[in-house]
Amino acid sequence: MLIKLPTEKTVSAAADALQAAVKANHFGVMQVHNLQETMVKKGVEFAQECLIFEVCQPQQAKKVLDENMSVSTALPCRISIYEEGGKTILATLKPTTLLALFDTPQLKSVAQEVEDTIVKIMKEAASG
């Protein structure tokens, strides 16, 4: 259900590398949420750094949405970068697992392609 990759990079360096890897793999970053910053703005003390990237590949999203608009509730894909146990972690929910919730077996290959690319993006960001 969850894919997690550790990296020796800081959250900031991993975020920069993720931006580049997303672009290199023909996905786009739609939004970046700074969870710590948002919590503080809402009056909640939150010491842990966490960035949540919303990423999308429009052609793949269209294939899925043309088949089942309910899948829009699971879009766009998200990749989080945070610290855990002294390491920086890149994490995402598996698109194949999410799409399985919508009973659309005909879209399994699309979900697998997206998942493979997201894992590739995460590996490039973690190591590159």
Regions found by a protein language model. Name each.
Residues M1-V29, K123:
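Terminal, regulation- and interaction-focused segments at domain boundaries
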Residues Q31-V32, G128:
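Flexible, glycine/charged-enriched surface loops at secondary-structure junctions
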Residues N34-I81:
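Compact, glycine-rich, soluble single-domain proteins
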Residues T73-G85, M122-G128:
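Short secondary-structure transition/capping segments
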Residues R78-T104:
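Beta-strand/loop substructures that line and gate deep hydrophobic ligand-binding cavities in soluble
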Residues L101-G128:
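Well-ordered alpha/beta subsegment
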